[in-house]
């Protein structure tokens, strides 16, 4: 056991985690050169296309160190994006140490900080690594100072490497073996294994990634899931050397995978403890804290026949993604679907894309909203995650919106722009600290503004240099109103949105104008209105298409022309009474983009 090292790699997006893990795998000979490819651990197509890591992956490698010993390295690659920080905390729970990778050109960013604090809270040994020293812009001295200043760990002798060229990666491994402590635990004790992650395989059922804290797990053992009390047979187990390799046993301190022929998706929840049925452990390991979704949106299949398939797909996906929340919802405009909760907009996009790709579904999404706390006049507190669930105005005593605490790190040059953006988003500054050339800003901004497009706009106002980390702080009373969209006098529930009263006029007007461009012209006029309660705040009309009924009249009598026009007018009137308007998917997405183009 003293030769096992469990560690994960934490870093901001694009600081080179995945490339560094490629090099480590190459040096330890996990894959032959023929099988080696860039970002070997980002196995999802989506991860490769966007160049981001979404799911944590684990690898077990053997490394022969300079002291002649052979060490077993279990390492877990983690995502860097703010929406997936819960993946990071799960990976860290299985480790004794973490490599903190910082780009020697970019320096410390908000995500680096957030993940590093998570690691320190869990008492992990953090080993700083300066990556990308081959870049002309690299300034390792400055970045080492930044790490000490901002993060507060000693980085004077931080390992310097370039994962791309392979320089210094050997030193990273040596430092790893030297500084990260071996796992603790009792190999003879009763089995306790932590489920770090699980996913669904069409042939094997549920596959779980586990870390053995105490005891030993052998093939054929009967295992018991501690939270549900159900027992299963350990049919197959093994490790990843990126490839799945079968083993007969997993020893104390190791990380591996386990297949128990669990057919039910909720059979092995992530963060749960496995133990042996014949000799169970007394208590479960501390799990992970449940992550609360921050953004909710309705997802509806385009054709109602896909509803069943959609439900199964969500079930399988939620197994792999503990933070996805969903419940059935029906809408008069879109039929049956699900109200889903996500951690942020990127998470929402990724889930929607995975559903469309991996499960071949066509989906319509409604505008994302956050959860509001509503106190009704009867003093009852309810939580509303969809505009259609908001009680009538006269029943609301107080409406409170979620406030997010946003930590931003940015170069001083962009401070003015970023402050302007925060103020425009109704933010309140709570803290500002200068670290050399960097500024650490803390603002309290309403969650609704953060999830809408704050991240994109922060990046564009700071030319990509600012970085953001946010978490939910509290609910606070606010003057929010529901803006309804009426089409030909009928409310479309899927288009309603909740916004602050000060912005409601503008949002309503912009939305109506956007919709006007997106709804195809019909044979009759379509009136699009935005309303707060019964008060109409904006209107625009999609003009009808008209056939030229006078084309066949040459010269001729005016009364003849009037008769034809009158006849056409009556026909249009009749059409309008029975006509339905089909809304394209773009119309629903228009809400997302309200207020983006005119900035």
UniProtKB/Swiss-Prot annotation:
GO terms, biological process: positive regulation of translation
Cellular localization per UniProt: Cell inner membrane
Single GO MF descriptor: GTP binding
Listed Gene3D superfamilies: 3.30.70.240, Elongation factor 4, C-terminal domain (3.30.70.2570), Elongation Factor G (Translational Gtpase), domain 3 (3.30.70.870), P-loop containing nucleotide triphosphate hydrolases (3.40.50.300), Translation factors (2.40.30.10)
Heme recorded as keyword: no
Keyword NAD: no
Keywords: Cell inner membrane, Cell membrane, GTP-binding, Hydrolase, Membrane, Nucleotide-binding, Protein biosynthesis
Topology class, membrane: Peripheral membrane protein
tr-type G domain boundaries: 2-184
Coiled-coil intervals, chain numbering: none
Binding, GTP: 14-19, 131-134
SUPFAM superfamilies: EF-G C-terminal domain-like, P-loop containing nucleoside triphosphate hydrolases
GO cellular component: plasma membrane
EC number: 3.6.5.n1
Principal location listed in the UniProt entry: membrane
Catalytically driven reaction(s): GTP + H2O = GDP + phosphate + H(+)
Similarity comment: Belongs to the TRAFAC class translation factor GTPase superfamily. Classic translation factor GTPase family. LepA subfamily.
Function field: Required for accurate and efficient protein synthesis under certain stress conditions. May act as a fidelity factor of the translation reaction, by catalyzing a one-codon backward translocation of tRNAs on improperly translocated ribosomes. Back-translocation proceeds from a post-translocation (POST) complex to a pre-translocation (PRE) complex, thus giving elongation factor G a second chance to translocate the tRNAs correctly. Binds to ribosomes in a GTP-dependent manner.
Protein name in UniProt: Elongation factor 4
Gene name linked to the record: lepA
């Amino acid at each position: 056991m003293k030769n096992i090292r469990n560690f994960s790699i934490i870093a901001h997006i694009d600081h080179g985690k995945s490339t560094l893990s490629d090099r480590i795998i190459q040096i330890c000979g996990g894959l032959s050169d023929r099988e080696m490819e860039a970002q070997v651990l980002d196995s999802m197509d989506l991860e490769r296309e966007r160049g981001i890591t979404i799911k944590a992956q684990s690898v077990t490698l053997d490394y022969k160190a300079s002291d002649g010993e052979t060490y077993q390295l279990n390492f877990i690659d983690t995502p860097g994006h703010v929406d997936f920080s819960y993946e990071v905390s799960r990976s860290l729970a299985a480790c004794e140490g973490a490599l903190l990778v910082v780009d020697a050109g970019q320096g410390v960013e908000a995500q680096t900080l957030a993940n590093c604090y998570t690691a320190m809270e869990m008492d992990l040994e953090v080993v700083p690594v300066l990556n990308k020293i081959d870049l002309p812009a690299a300034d390792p001295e400055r970045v080492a100072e930044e790490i000490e200043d901002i993060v507060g760990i000693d980085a004077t002798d931080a390992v310097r490497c370039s994962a791309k060229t392979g320089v210094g990666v050997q030193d990273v491994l040596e430092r790893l073996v030297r500084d990260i402590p071996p796992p603790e635990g009792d190999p003879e004790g009763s089995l306790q294994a932590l489920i770090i992650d699980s996913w669904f395989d069409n042939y094997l059922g549920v596959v779980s990634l586990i870390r053995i804290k105490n005891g030993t797990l052998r093939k054929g053992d009967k295992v018991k899931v501690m939270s549900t009390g159900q027992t299963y047979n350990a049919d197959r187990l093994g490790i990843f050397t990126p490839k799945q390799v079968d083993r007969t046993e997993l020893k104390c301190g190791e990380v591996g995978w386990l297949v128990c022929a669990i057919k039910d998706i909720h059979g092995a929840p992530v963060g749960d403890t496995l133990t042996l049925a014949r000799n169970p452990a007394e208590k479960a390991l501390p799990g992970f804290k449940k992550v609360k979704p921050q953004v909710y949106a309705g997802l509806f299949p385009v054709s109602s026949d896909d509803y069943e398939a959609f439900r199964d797909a969500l079930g399988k996906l939620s197994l792999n993604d503990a933070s996805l929340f969903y419940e059935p919802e029906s809408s008069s405009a879109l039929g049956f679907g699900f109200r889903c909760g996500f951690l942020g907009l990127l998470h929402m996009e990724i889930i929607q894309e995975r559903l469309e790709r991996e499960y071949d579904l066509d989906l319509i999404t409604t505008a994302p909203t956050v959860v509001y706390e509503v106190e009704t006049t009867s003093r009852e507190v309810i939580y509303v995650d969809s505009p259609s669930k908001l009680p009538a105005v006269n029943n609301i005593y107080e409406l409170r919106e979620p406030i997010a605490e946003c930590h931003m790190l940015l170069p001083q040059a962009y401070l003015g722009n970023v402050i302007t953006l925060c103020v425009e988003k109704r933010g309140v500054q709570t803290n500002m600290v200068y670290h050399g050339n960097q500024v650490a800003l803390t603002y309290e901004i309403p969650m609704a503004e953060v999830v809408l497009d704050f991240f994109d706009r922060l990046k564009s106002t700071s030319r990509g240099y600012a970085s953001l980390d946010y978490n939910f702080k509290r609910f606070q009373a606010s003057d929010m109103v529901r803006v309804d969209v009426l089409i030909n006098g009928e409310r479309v529930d899927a288009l309603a949105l909740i916004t602050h009263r000060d912005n409601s006029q503008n949002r309503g007007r912009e939305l109506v104008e956007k919709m006007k461009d997106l709804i195809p012209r019909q044979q009759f006029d379509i009136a699009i209105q935005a309303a707060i309660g019964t008060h109409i705040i904006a209107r625009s009309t999609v003009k009808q298409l008209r056939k030229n009924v006078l084309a066949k009249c040459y010269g001729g009598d005016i009364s003849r022309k009037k008769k034809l026009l009158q006849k056409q007018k009556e026909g249009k009137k009749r059409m309008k009474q029975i006509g339905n308007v089909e809304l394209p998917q773009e119309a629903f997405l228009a809400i997302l983009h309200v207020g983006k183009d005119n900035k």
